[in-house]
């Protein structure tokens, strides 16, 4: 089942570090089953509060493949520039739909 990596940039503190990340990150995808769907394209914040400076969505073949990329030596060496240059919210989301309402967000149920 596919998995989606979503990065939301919430603020930039050092653009030079971020530009280094942008330059050095694409080769880290080599050898991984990944498709970049969107990166830093125009967006609209429809709900909630920002700040949102930019959004990235990538599709991996599985959660395991995404974690393998995230922990790969190539990406570990590069991601330090992203972390130094900006504040991001990073999410890894399992693809698919939870059909049963009872199974959606079980952590939010009140305990009786």
Residue ranges and their predicted role:
Residues 1-54, 61-71, 94-112:
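Short S/T/G/P-rich N-terminal loop/turn motif that feeds into the first structured element of a domain
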Residues 76-91:
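C-terminal structural segments of small proteins and small subunits
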């Amino acid at each position: 089942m596919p998995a989606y990596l979503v990065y939301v940039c919430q603020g930039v503190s050092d653009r030079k570090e971020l530009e280094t990340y942008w330059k050095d990150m694409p080769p880290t995808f080599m050898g991984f089953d990944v498709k970049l769907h969107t990166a830093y394209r125009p967006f609209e914040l429809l709900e909630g509060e920002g700040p949102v400076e930019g959004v990235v969505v990538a599709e991996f073949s599985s959660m395991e493949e995404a974690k393998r990329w995230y922990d790969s030596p190539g990406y570990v060496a590069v991601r330090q520039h992203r972390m130094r240059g900006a504040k991001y919210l990073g999410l890894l989301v399992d693809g698919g739909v939870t059909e049963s309402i009872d199974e959606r967000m079980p952590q939010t149920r009140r305990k009786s």
